[in-house]
Amino acid sequence: MMQYVLKNGIILDGTENMKPVTGHMIRIENDRIAEILPEDSPVSGCEVIDLKGAYVLPGLINLHVHLATSGKPPRANKKPTNYKRLFQILSRSRLVKFVLKRMLRGYARTELMSGVTTIRTVGGILDMDARIRDEINERKIQGPRILAGNTGVSVPGGHFAGSIATEAESPEQARVHVRQIASTGPDHIKLMITGGVMDASEEGEPGVLRMPPEIVKAACEEAHRMGYKVAAHVESPEGVRVALENGVDTVEHGAKLDDDMLRLFKERGASPVCTISPALPYAVFDLSESHAAPVAKKNGRIVMDGIIECARACRDSGIPVGLGNDVGCPFILHYNFWRELYYYHKYVGASNRETLYTATLGNAGLAGIAGETGSIEKGKSADLIVVKQNALDDLTDLRNVSMVMVRGDLIRNPKVKRMKHVDDMLDRYM
């Protein structure tokens, strides 16, 4: 592998109190950050890359990804997708699975090209996420580091039941499903505890508790026994309480919290993963833009407000908050994670510095990989991005990265295929 020296750049190292550092260069050896040294130090045997005053940051970490879908917006007058039926068709055809896997590889690569060097998937088709992870780890294909969730666990009638999540009807079935998922090589286990906006037909349904507490407890116990952390889809106060009381490690999305729930977060060492992106189009777009039913707009607002209130309350209480954008949901494309950072700053009230830390070293800590990535420090994986302006001043500068490095592999002038009409719609609500 090549060895590089990045010079004439301004370093934002991803640590909690990061500030622009000049006069230093970064030496990359194989897949590691070998050292950070004064710019006048002699170097040899390396390709020297002149950053010409650009900013170099740790690669972003997206904690809530669905590789199974593109994120394209729905078409007008289109019937809602029957995901369970679609999954049945996909799982029966080897040819369709082959084509689908190629698409998923492409989505993973798009994440990388946009500056996301690590993704955490939380609900996918069969074992495809882990297979793609392994192909990347074996350097058969190029992509971000993947922490794979594979298929999740739901209940009959629950969120994405029968598609990207199996259906458990009892605590013992939940244990069986967890063991079956574990046999496919995931990095964690995903549960679907409440309903969601996309499968709700009545106002308030996204937060309806679907998974009984005893099933949540059984699934968490089995996952923990096998060494896996548990992430759970939760969009109501009742769901948050059930999740925390029964062993969930990360509450994906969230809802309004009371003091007792905050106490549970602290006692259990749990954290929320803030995902404003998927709720925003439903909440703020005109129905002529979102092509959603009126009830989805109302539910989108309920969910968006709950996610923001959850993240804000946890942040104010000193509970670490993670960031993910639920990519794959309508309007949430695989190159737009930077928007979630902007929303976290705008709606939750975090400073740009805190937001950058959250999306890099903070997220790495929640994912259990802070010793490997998330900051520009000697010995860590060479996962870096370069942008022309200072993201501490304006987070939207993360929209366009001029260079990406993942595990020492350098990508110059990375390109993504954008959907301009979607970007224009989202830009109007920034």
Where do the language-model regions lie?
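Histidine/acidic residue-rich metal-binding segments in metalloenzymes
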Residues: R131, E172-P272, D286-H291, R301-V321
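Histidine/acidic-residue-rich catalytic or RNA/ligand-binding cores of hydrolases
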Residues: K72-P74, D129, D199-E202, V240-N246, ...
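Active-site metal-binding motif and surrounding structural segment of the metallo-beta-lactamase
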Residues: E39-L57
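Metal-associated gating/positioning segment near the N- to mid-region
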Residues: Y55-E135, E214
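Active-site gating loops and adjacent loop-to-helix segments of metal-dependent hydrolytic enzymes
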Residues: T69-L100, N150, V155-A161, G196-R210, ...
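Active-site microenvironment of metallo-dependent hydrolases
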Residues: M1-H24, E29, E39, L90-R92, ...
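His/Asp/Glu-enriched, well-ordered alpha-helical/loop segment
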Residues: R225, K229, P294-V295, D305-N390
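Divalent metal-dependent hydrolysis catalytic cores, especially in the metallo-beta-lactamase
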Residues: R92-K97, L104-A130, G143-S154, P186-A200, ...
